[in-house]
C-alpha cells in the first residue's frame, strides 16, 4: 500500500496541476505536427511500436474508450459523492461519460463514412487496377482487394480526447481528502494510479501514431476532432448551467469554479 500511495502522490503532482490542463492540448498538437514532419522528412526505422500488433495497440489503444470509461466511472462516482454527498449531482456528473460515448460514436462514424466515400478498391497495395464495381471496404477486403480512401486518424482523435478528459476529471483531487484507514482512500488511490498510467499510455501511443502511422492531414483532422470534442465540452458546454458540469472544486455543489475557466 505504501508503494501505491507513493505512486499516486507522484501522479497527482504531475497530472493534477492547472498548468497540465492548460498546456497539454497545445503539447499534443505540437507533438503531432513534429512527429508527422519527422515521419515525412526522416522516417524512423521500424520497431516493435511500429507494428500494429504490439501489445499496447491491441489491448489498450483499440479499446481506449472502454478503458477510459470503465476507470472514470468509479473515479467520478466516488470523488464527487465524497465531496458533495448528493446522488443526483453524482449522476449528473456521470453523464459526462454518456456525452463522451456519443462523441466517440459520432466521430468514428464520420471517419468511417469519409473513408468509404473517398475510397476505391484496388487489386494491389500499389493502388493498381481499380475495381469499378461498387464495393464497401469490408467487401473489398473480403475479395482480396485493397481499400484506399481518406483515413482520418481515429487514434489521434481518441487518444487526444481520452487523455484530456482524464486530466480534466482528475482535477477534483485538489479537494479530495480521505482518512488513510478508510476503504475509500484505498479505492481512490488505486484509481488515481490506474488513470495516471492510462494517461501516460495514451500520450505515448499518440506520439507513436504521430511518428509511425497515417499522413499529416489525416492526423491533423483526427487531432482536431479530439481537441474540439474536449473544448466543446469542458471548455464551453460544461460551463453552462444546463450541462453535466465540471468536477466540483469544493464541498459545495457549485460546479462552475473560476480555476476551470480558460
From Swiss-Prot:
Fatty acyl-coenzyme A (CoA) diphosphatase that hydrolyzes fatty acyl-CoA to yield acyl-4'-phosphopantetheine and adenosine 3',5'-bisphosphate. Preferentially hydrolyzes unsaturated long-chain acyl-CoA substrates such as oleoyl-CoA/(9Z)-octadecenoyl-CoA and arachidonoyl-CoA/(5Z,8Z,11Z,14Z)-eicosatetraenoyl-CoA in the endoplasmic reticulum (ER) lumen. This catalytic activity is required for maintaining ER structure and for lipid droplets (LDs) biogenesis, which are lipid storage organelles involved in maintaining lipid and energy homeostasis. The chain crosses the membrane at residues 24-44, 58-78, 94-114, 146-166, 186-206, 219-239. Belongs to the FIT family. FIT2 subfamily. GO terms for cellular component: endoplasmic reticulum membrane. The keyword ATP-binding does not apply. Its main location: endoplasmic reticulum. InterPro entries: FIT, FITM1/2. It holds the Pfam family FIT. It comes from the Eukaryota. One of its GO terms (molecular function) is triglyceride binding. Keywords: Endoplasmic reticulum, Hydrolase, Lipid metabolism, Membrane, Transmembrane, Transmembrane helix. The active site is at residues 155, 214. It catalyses: an acyl-CoA + H2O = an acyl-4'-phosphopantetheine + adenosine 3',5'-bisphosphate + 2 H(+); (9Z)-octadecenoyl-CoA + H2O = S-(9Z-octadecenoyl)-4'-phosphopantetheine + adenosine 3',5'-bisphosphate + 2 H(+); (5Z,8Z,11Z,14Z)-eicosatetraenoyl-CoA + H2O = S-(5Z,8Z,11Z,14Z-eicosatetraenoyl)-4'-phosphopantetheine + adenosine 3',5'-bisphosphate + 2 H(+); hexadecanoyl-CoA + H2O = S-hexadecanoyl-4'-phosphopantetheine + adenosine 3',5'-bisphosphate + 2 H(+). One of its GO terms (biological process) is fatty-acyl-CoA catabolic process. The keyword Transmembrane applies. Its EC number is 3.6.1.-. Residues 1-23, 79-93, 167-185, 240-262 are cytoplasmic. This is Acyl-coenzyme A diphosphatase FITM2. It comes from Sus scrofa (Pig).
Amino acid at each position: 500500500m505504501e508503494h501505491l500511495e507513493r505512486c499516486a502522490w507522484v501522479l497527482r503532482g504531475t497530472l493534477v496541476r492547472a498548468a497540465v490542463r492548460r498546456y497539454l492540448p497545445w503539447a499534443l498538437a505540437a507533438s503531432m505536427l513534429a512527429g508527422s514532419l519527422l515521419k515525412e522528412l526522416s522516417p524512423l526505422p521500424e520497431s516493435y511500436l511500429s507494428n500494429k500488433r504490439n501489445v499496447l495497440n491491441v489491448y489498450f489503444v483499440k479499446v481506449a474508450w472502454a478503458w477510459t470509461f470503465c476507470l472514470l466511472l468509479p473515479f467520478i462516482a466516488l470523488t464527487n459523492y465524497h465531496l458533495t454527498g448528493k446522488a443526483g449531482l453524482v449522476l449528473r456528473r456521470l453523464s459526462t461519460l454518456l456525452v463522451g460515448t456519443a462523441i466517440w460514436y459520432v466521430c468514428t462514424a464520420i471517419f468511417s463514412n469519409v473513408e468509404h466515400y473517398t475510397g476505391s478498391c484496388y487489386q494491389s497495395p500499389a493502388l493498381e487496377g481499380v475495381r469499378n464495381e461498387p464495393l464497401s471496404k469490408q467487401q473489398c477486403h473480403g475479395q482480396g482487394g485493397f481499400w484506399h480512401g481518406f483515413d482520418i486518424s481515429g487514434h489521434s482523435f481518441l487518444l487526444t480526447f481520452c487523455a484530456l478528459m482524464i486530466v480534466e476529471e482528475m482535477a477534483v483531487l485538489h479537494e479530495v481528502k480521505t482518512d488513510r484507514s478508510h476503504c475509500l482512500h484505498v479505492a481512490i488511490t488505486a484509481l488515481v494510479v490506474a488513470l495516471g498510467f492510462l494517461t501516460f499510455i495514451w500520450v505515448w501511443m499518440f506520439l507513436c501514431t504521430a511518428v509511425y502511422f497515417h499522413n499529416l492531414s489525416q492526423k491533423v483532422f483526427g487531432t482536431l476532432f479530439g481537441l474540439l470534442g474536449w473544448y466543446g465540452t469542458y471548455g464551453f458546454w460544461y460551463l453552462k448551467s444546463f450541462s453535466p458540469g465540471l468536477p466540483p472544486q469544493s464541498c459545495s455543489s457549485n460546479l462552475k469554479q473560476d480555476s476551470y475557466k480558460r
